[in-house]
Amino acid sequence: MGGRSGDLLDRRTSRRGFTCVLEFSDSDTNVDPVSVLMGNESAFIGKINNDDFKKMCSRMNWNEDRGTAYIESVVGAPFYDLSDPVVVSHTRANKLITSPVSYNELVVWTQGKIRDSETDKLLGPTATNEALKTLLGSEVSANIIWKANSLEYSVPKLTALYAKGDRSIPHIFWTKQTLEFNSPQCHEWSAMDEISKNDPLDPLVMWPYLEEDEERTLKDLHTEIRIWYSLRTGRNPVKQTVSAAPSKSTLEYVPWVTRNMSYRSLPVQISYQSSHGLLWRGNRPQLYSSTLFGDNTVELTPYDMSQPYVNNDPFVEMIPFNREIHNDYDFCWKQLNDEYFMRKLPAQGEDSSNMFVVGDSTFFLGMGSVAIAWATTLGAGAGIHQRKIRQVVARRYKTDDVSGHALSALLMHSSHFYWYLYEIYLNHKSSKSVYAFPFREQKSGRYHSISEYKGALDAALQLNLPDFAIKRLGQFTKFLKKLDL
């Protein structure tokens, strides 16, 4: 994000893993999505009450998979299955599995680009996998599950591809991603056993991968895989030791998941390549539902209308825009090609054959928190210059409360920003939670007063925000004036 200030560089985008897991329970729900997303809960096992879950699914007319996907998305954490080969405690993981695994449990993940020293070309994840299969030979490569962590297809294309293989597409969920290599929480796969003995890791901290690095070659990666394969299976040994492996790894060990498993039973370790919040590695952002502000419609700018989005989530169904049925929507999504969508204000009489809206906007209730958590990783939020923020608010509004969400929202993608404003609108009008599920939130009723939101925006002026965030600030201010009428 070009032009961001030093203030916004104080936080790095290393918080891309999750800090808790969820489990269904007969006990009361003890999860507050905001606390989890903002990193206030560490190695925390959250309980989701079974009866509350069933009631939500019945009320929203959702099946179990959709309900599970919704909760994972708004909490930013996955459910785990006790059958997973990971021992979990309520504080830290006791250990990671260390015994040799069978052939069908070996998975190679590749991410980013790597240089082929023979052709001097940079290979993407899929091309890297194919080249590695050739180098390893059929006897070894046939016993490895190959995954390319590259979002190359839109959901319609993925659906068609999976249908050919008689497989259903699980929910594509951002927290099931690996962390960045340079995160201090990441460790090399080759040291896994030793680390798990001496300094138990959270089981949900995935093994590192490498961002684009032109110094590493396909040959290096080939060597690593052979070593890793030998260590994990005890077969096909090679005359190299762990210490001979390169210092960086693009590998991740995850157990294989059988075909046609229900979404709820998917192992935690299975990773898919999307985010409902801030996308990374160059992927386009996930489109959110159109808003229904009514009289409080926030006017979209030409910049807002020019941003391309994708729909990476098979639970987000796009239905044709109908002028009579959807006349209260603030905008619709115009499909540009098989992958990209752009917001559109349909003119009267205009052909709407390639225009769509999200079929079930309730699936996004609370998604504003997901997007905010991702924007926070870029440095905004009540944690930055907290003393200055509190002083500004206390001096002008005679209160020490401030909406940290409002500060973070200024850095969100435009579609996500408008949805967050819509959630403020819903909460302010109803004085009820914006979530479809009864989480244990810190506040009931209205989350903040109009003055507290205004205080946050005043405080934001004390930060050296990038230009696009300043524009968001103006839109937010106009929205609050309409809401306060």
Curated annotation (Swiss-Prot):
Annotated protein name in UniProt: Putative non-structural protein 1
Species of origin: Micromonas pusilla reovirus (isolate Netherlands/2005)
